[in-house]
Amino acid sequence: MTMVRFERVSKRYGAGKDALSNINFELARGEFAFLTGHSGAGKSTLLKLMMLMERPTRGKIIVDDQDLTTMRLGQVPYHRRKVGVVFQNHQLLFDRTIFDNVALPLQIAGYTPTEAARRVRAALDSVGLLGMEGRNPIELSGGEQQRVGIARAVVHKPALLLADEPTGNLDPELSEEIMNLFLRFQQVGVTVLIATHDIALIERMGHRRLILDHGKLHCSEFQSRKRSANEMPGDDHG
């Protein structure tokens, strides 16, 4: 079944050229894929369209059987509850605790304090940070801060998880650890799309790759896997 479908989607800002031009692709439910391309290729714009931070100039976007191009403004918050987003710079609140950062989407959505606390602990447990709820993000390493960002993105159990350069500021070892987390969410049925410049990481992972070139989808291809189907990133030690 299809989770995401773009049909002849274009996005133009002002009188300039198209940031995205005639984009067509599908992502299956539970699929893991990468979105890559040069700086300015349109990766962030494509993700913003899926989050309804932007609207397309032309074409149709379907996410979880909902047509985003005709969605009313009042429906947007409900759509965003289905989507988790991870940013390169974490976008954490450094004057709040880790618990407060992760709980923020639940508070906005109106969850009770008891249910929010349960979900926050479960999300932190899933990224290996359970027991650190009372600490401040500034006390954490870059990799740990990114884990907090991932916990916040999945705390409301989204069907679709988007990440924009989530390993851009991390060394290769930490990058693989973060990718390992994304794979775990994909293995329980979450559709994952990761925008990244890290071609070496993409090639090691061996998943489908969507390649943007000056706003056009250059190709959609599967990499030959360099790992067995049940081998996780970071399992090689020799």
Ranges and model annotations:
Residues 51:
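Helix-to-loop junction immediately C-terminal to a conserved catalytic motif
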Residues 161-164:
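Catalytic Walker B motif of ABC-type/P-loop ATPase nucleotide-binding domains
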